Amino acid sequence: MYQRGYPDKVKVYQARDYHPISLRKVINPARLPILPCNTLTVDIVIKNGLMVLPSGITQGSLVIDDGKIIGILKSSEPKADRVIDATGKVVLPGMIDMHVHLRDPGFPEREDFESGTRAAAAGGVTTVIDMPNTVPATVTLEAFNQKKAIANGKSLVDFGFIGGAGEVPQKDIIELAQAGATAFKSFLIARFKELAASDYTLLKHMQLLSELDRPLLVHAENGDIVDKYMEEAVASGRTDPLAHCDFRPDIAEIEAVMRCITLAAEADCHLHICHMSAGGSVDLLEWAQSTGQLVT
């Protein structure tokens, strides 16, 4: 789901038409037309700004109508309901942050849709995609609609939601996809409860999401390796910050990434590995991409 972050004027774009995290549907700025002067009346014109395009740096006017960039003018511009003079400024597109934890509902004192999206806007992020591990987790249509209602009233930027997969029944995943969930997420560590998935369920959900044209995001760590190493850390009395690194070895991530890549290849599912930290994981990602597999 992707929505305008304005409570008084909400637009909904189904995920089939707009995948913020899918590399299959990327707008190529090189294809934007350099429009001639015309008599159109549009919503917004940002004039005299510097724009960095694939062809080089261009000074001109950005023409926006109905929420979309419709062209670039090098000299004059059409009439507009709002004109922004960007003389001396660089015009940049708003960034999309597809991995956001706003903790709302459940723990709004940590961060909620207002405080989180206010910070996003200040940093140039104009679309946030919220993760499912809130309380309740976004694993049912009821929880999805609850979070949507909260975001409608608080969000200052555009937003979308990732549904939880884990061991969630497939009928619920289908309902979430139909409601507009942009993607789904599973964890490979048991402490994430209903968001954690066995290998069998991981494969079955990948097959379903391939049919639904939704990516699966994975927190990829070998839970057994992590748990046993953490037991060693406690037994050794280590409490320093580096203990977290020493007792969470690269192989725990690398093995899980390889497992996910293998299952996703079998299911023909778009796989997205979240927050990779090991060089060996990057090597596996590059190898999978070189074979033509859709993994990011």
Where are these regions (language model features)?
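Divalent metal-coordination and catalytic microenvironments
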Residues: 49, 67, 88, 99, ...
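Histidine-rich, glycine-flanked metal-binding segment
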Residues: 34-93
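Metal-associated gating/positioning segment near the N- to mid-region
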Residues: 86-154
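Histidine/acidic residue-rich metal-binding segments in metalloenzymes
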Residues: 171-296
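Intrinsic-disorder-associated, low-complexity terminal segments enriched in Asp/Asn/His/Tyr and depleted
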Residues: 2, 6-8, 13, 17-19, ...
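Short, acidic/polar
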Residues: 110-117, 167-176
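A glycine-rich helix N-cap at a beta->alpha junction
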Residues: 150-164
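Short catalytic-loop micro-motif centered on adjacent basic/acidic residues
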Residues: 130, 160-163, 270-275
